[in-house]
Amino acid sequence: MLEADLVSKMLRAVLQSHKNGIALPRLQGEYRSLTGDWIPFKQLGYPTLEAYLRSVPAVVRIETSRSGEVTCYAVACTETARIAQLVARQRSSKRKTGRQVNCQMRVKKTMPFFLEGKPKATLRQPGFSSDFSVSKKPNSTLLRNKGISLGVKSDAEVLPYTLQTTIGNEVFKDVPVQSHMTMSTNNRFSPKASLPPRFQMHLSRTCTKEMSDNLNQAVEKPNVTPPASYTYKMDEVQNRIKEILNKHSNGIWISKLPHFYKELYKEELNQGILQQFEHWPHICTVEKPCSGGQDLLLYPAKRKQLLRSELNTEKVPPSPLPAPKQIPPLKGCPAVMPGDFKEKVAELLVKYSSGLWASALPKTFEDMYKVKLPEDALKNLDLLSDVCTVDYISGNPQKAILYAKLPSPADKILKDAEQAHGNYDIKSTVEQEYLQIEENIAESTDTFMETVTIPPLIIPTETSPSVLVVELSNTNEVVIRYVGKDYSAAQELMEDEMKEYYSKNSKVTPVQTVQIGQLLAVNAEEDAWLRAQVISMEEGKIKVCYVDYGFSENVEKSKAYRLNPKFCSLSFQATKCKLAGLEVLSDDPDLVKVVESLTCGKIFAVEILEKTDIPLVVLYDTSGEDDININATCLKAICDKSLEVHLQVDAMYTNVRVTNICSDGTLYCQVPCKGLNKLNDLLHKIEEYFHCKHMTSEYFVSLPFCGKVCLFHCKGKWLRVEITNVHSSRALDVQFLDAGTVTSVKVSELREIPPRFLQEMISVPPQAIKCCLADLPQSIGMWTPDAVLWLRDSVLNCSDCSIKVTKVDETRGIAHIYLFTPKNFPDPHRSINRQITNADLWKHQKDVFLSAISSGASSPNTKSANTPILGNTGETFRKSLTDVLKKSVVNHPSSFFTKELPPPVHLSKPGEHMDVYVPVACHPGYFVIQPWQEIHKLEVLMEEMILYYSVSEERHVAVEKDQVYAAKVENKWHRVLLKGILTNGLVSVYELDYGKHELVNMRKVQPLADMFRKLPFQAVTAQLAGVKCNQWSEEASMVFRNHVEKKPLVALVQTVIENTNPWDRKVVVYLVDTSLPDTDIWIHDFMSEYLVELSKVN
């Protein structure tokens, strides 16, 4: 029986290591990374993980955010109070070296408007023979027709595919291998009663809690740290790799090395080590075959590899090892003699363990040996049967595959023993030579070090990489370090090797003389060894800059050593960036101080706008519930405080203008003050400036980004707006800083603030004050459209209202007020607060959205709580965004009432393939595909819908089930099918272009205009062919989802099931991932293998 106390103690320890808590989907992965086991909630008698966590409130505190994310926090006890205090202080502003970078930071990604898939041109098109049978499983060998084609035996076993594994935000890719090859059954599956690590790694990426009813809900990828088994002593691993290579003197594919490693030592080989072999010349020789693939060949370390340096060859001691035999290229490439032919073919095939097409043999033979293959060699392949296995495909000699003949067990034992004995004899010699070379390197002059070239730092290609802000002197030169596998993780690995090298190598001594600019290895604090560059020199001390951390320090000469060239292959990790939107104030001391206090020593997600030498970026703090734009926050923090409006409690203010009313009753007001007067003066000057100056392209916004402040022209004057959401290169959302209004506009309608006014304009704080009516009865509850309409008609854009402040809630940034119209001031009994409570406006009908409206009143612009309600003036300026869209509303008055449906989307015929994108994947029995060729048209339609519905007048809709509408979901308008009506004002909709089920407020549902009914609905439900399973487990669904969701794939159509409703059509397809350069991954093969593994475990 499991000890519940032990589990709870381990759980508390895991939670205490994360002071900001752990999201519930990531908890299992974090627990397993530290303990090696999953949380056994089922064995403890609980149906779900959450149920178990709620049963131990003394250990776990569970909180649910507004977005619905469940986060777990540790509850400290007396025994662990000291630990809790240390964890609370673990992030300090002090500069530290070594392991101070949190590589596991979660980045909240929003749904991109443009898909993050590869363009269609990069998807390889699989070619299939004309006699293809739908019922027959397609042969993967037919997918490839380039380079060296690798074949498959008719009875070949299916090997596990090489797939990418995600740990936290970092993607580790195994070196791809051919997906099919011959292998004994004994070696195919692990005999252990557990899933293979690659399956476990994929499962650890997502939560193990019970499936949500909404299967389309995005599952956040957890930040799983590598398990303890991946922590190796480097020398032990290197010795083991030497032993493996000594047993395979003819070479071994790097992708096969983890398999042999596990077979011999019963441990997993860290995939990160595979990237280091090119830097270990004393361990192995790395060779890239001429086939053009990414797989590499490894050989035992040879003298030839050791001599590859810029040292004078005279300094290298002579070696007893014979030089490798080289075949010089001959003019005309004469044919090889028959006596040597078979031997060379056998030697060649050893390098292609997955087989080689016979048709590819002549070219491969010539590339390797620089001689031509005999012309009649392929006419009778049976002559090669003594040196290789010939496998004919469909009886066609041209389709034969050649395999190297495996030695018999007895021969293999003798050969391995002989090879091991031979390698043992030369092992000490090789190691002595390598140590001698290292000693010569250490003793080399400073001139040698000047020839070392450090590769430049490559900007990450991922959408939102993480960075650690180190320091800054101005906002145009902020020192940062990228966080990730090829950056901070690679640096940590290198520093471990540096510590190992300099701590244990007694022959390495401190430098005696140094030069400015010279690279050194410095023994810094906490016994860390860091790379540094000399800045200046004093007696006994050197001022160095730590090139991977970006700050400088004076160090003793006794702590400085010459940097070994093997530590020069990694780029300097400290680099600089420029904060977008702050360029004009980059040297302002107040701004620099604010930026430094908010950013230094912290990790942020970064949006890279321009990839230049000093990239232009926007920083986001994603540690809380909402992403915080650091650039915009710093800009607002340096506003002129004397221009802000400070409302006083019980004070009366006159000539107040109500600029915006939201559907929850929130108001935005402008109060006369010094800041408002200066703003109006600046806007008037800008109006005159643009009137006198010709509008050139420099004033158009060429690079929109969130947080950018610019100008928008409406009702004959310029107004300040801040970009809040960029939908695409054409459409975006803006907020009017001085009115509180939010709307969608075209990028082409925005203008840059002229440079001469920019600094003054930024100094003026936003003039829209957020208010709410005070002392409204609690029984009112949700505002009805009628109440919002009455309030709008009463006060919106009235410039001479008055307010009395009763309370200022600084935490929420809202003031509670009594509002008066000019006729009723200052009688409190005739205030708007009293009138609206007495009015018959709060009668919630069975469906408040179908309430009767008098013929004299226009339809109210009712939106959600955070969406503005605009009066006549607001409507006018919104409709002035674009004349084209305005005309489209007038010219299509009947478009709201049509029920015409677009034609069904075109699908390939059975037996044909098509490029698809998978936006949603629940399990192999249900996922959604989109035709890749139509995605661009869908993006254009989405842009047009955003602009159209932002200027069109909202209507009360008598919604009906199973009808098509337009609905606003997460700031975007979608074509939806209404699936159900709930009693709480929400409706269930199905996105016809993306295949997702969503719940939205009925106020966000509008008629679908006729112009948006032309493009076929893009979402097609699909089922995976080639696998049979009545019910897919949660774990299997996760594995499938991680391999196909949000990815462009090639689909081979097996069956198309037609239906009169386009959203009820279904297609049965094979899915193929062609993203890897030399391997096609058939998803049904992978899932079949997974089911076999799962059945063995169960």
From Swiss-Prot:
Modified residues (Phosphoserine): 319, 859
Disulfide-bonded cysteines: none
Main location: cytoplasm
Keywords, sorted A to Z: Cytoplasm, Differentiation, Phosphoprotein, Repeat, RNA-binding, Spermatogenesis
Chain positions covered by the region annotation Interaction with CABLES1: 893-1098
Compartments, as annotated in UniProt: Cytoplasm
CDD domains the UniProt entry points to: LOTUS_1_TDRD7, LOTUS_2_TDRD7, LOTUS_3_TDRD7, Tudor_TDRD7_rpt1, Tudor_TDRD7_rpt2, Tudor_TDRD7_rpt3
Keyword Protease: no
InterPro entries for the chain: LOTUS-like, OST-HTH/LOTUS_dom, SNase_OB-fold_sf, TDRD7_LOTUS_3, Tudor, Tudor_domain_containing, Tudor_TDRD7_rpt2, Tudor_TDRD7_rpt3
GO molecular function, one term: mRNA binding
Pfam families, per the entry: OST-HTH, TUDOR
Region described as Interaction with CDK17: 861-1098
GO-annotated biological processes: lens fiber cell differentiation; lens morphogenesis in camera-type eye; P granule organization; piRNA processing; post-transcriptional regulation of gene expression; spermatogenesis
GO cellular component entries: P granule; ribonucleoprotein granule
Entry coiled-coil feature ranges: none
Residues covered by the HTH OST-type domain: 3-76, 233-302, 337-406
All residue ranges annotated as the Tudor domain in the record: 513-570, 703-760
Top-level taxon of origin: Eukaryota
Function statement: Component of specific cytoplasmic RNA granules involved in post-transcriptional regulation of specific genes: probably acts by binding to specific mRNAs and regulating their translation. Required for lens transparency during lens development, by regulating translation of genes such as CRYBB3 and HSPB1 in the developing lens. Also required during spermatogenesis.
Family per similarity comment: Belongs to the TDRD7 family.
Subunit structure: Found in a mRNP complex, at least composed of TDRD1, TDRD6, TDRD7 and DDX4. Found in a complex containing CABLES1, CDK16 and CDK17. Interacts with CABLES1, CDK17 and PIWIL1.
Protein name, entry field: Tudor domain-containing protein 7
UniProt source species: Bos taurus (Bovine)
Protein encoded by which gene: TDRD7
